[in-house]
């Protein structure tokens, strides 16, 4: 379980996170939503210890990640897989080597075991035959899948998805949403989706956390989201629908 307790963070005296608290239960998929500049990415970086709060705590399985040694922080980080926005594949490595990278960096596995694990991960993301391809030979959706294979290579307990559908056409975005749902259930991981894509939220999330002007404005289930009359939350949802120009369900 992850607990965020009264988190504060400012940059150049500009508050970005203000008294943010959040509890993420094991096995759930939670979507962190909000406008650009609302603090979503900054909160995500705090979850894996890339940023330290000015005040407050982040606890992973009861451990304050900002009060441990660097070696212990590395151990905690190994429990997280991250699907970075855009995929962030290494251009100089083929798909196989991209997925193998964390295995070579953080484990002492033999080459045979690395080969087996990479192939297993590529099959899980439904790309069993792309190992030899370079990133520039892959479509946007395929890059996301390879990046997701890399994110699950170390068998994490938590996966952070940073804007997983940004830049994808609706059909490909739907496929990525379905893959995320499938992997979260098959691998029994906790999913944390940082997004402004309400289509993805409705497709994959169990709960939603809405950041507004650096504060945690609203937290609830999808059912509670549908029933909410919170004016700020509703304005965000309606703006998302308007910007996309179609009903919030991509399959509608």
Label every PLM stretch briefly:
Residues 134-138, 142:
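Conserved ABC ATPase signature
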Residues 63-64, 111-129:
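Conserved ABC ATPase "signature" region
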Residues 153-157:
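A short, proline-enriched helix->beta-strand linker immediately N-terminal to the Walker B motif
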Residues 159-162:
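Catalytic Walker B motif of ABC-type/P-loop ATPase nucleotide-binding domains
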Residues 170-172:
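Helix N-cap at the start of a conserved alpha-helix in ABC-type nucleotide-binding domains
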Residues 48:
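Helix-to-loop junction immediately C-terminal to a conserved catalytic motif
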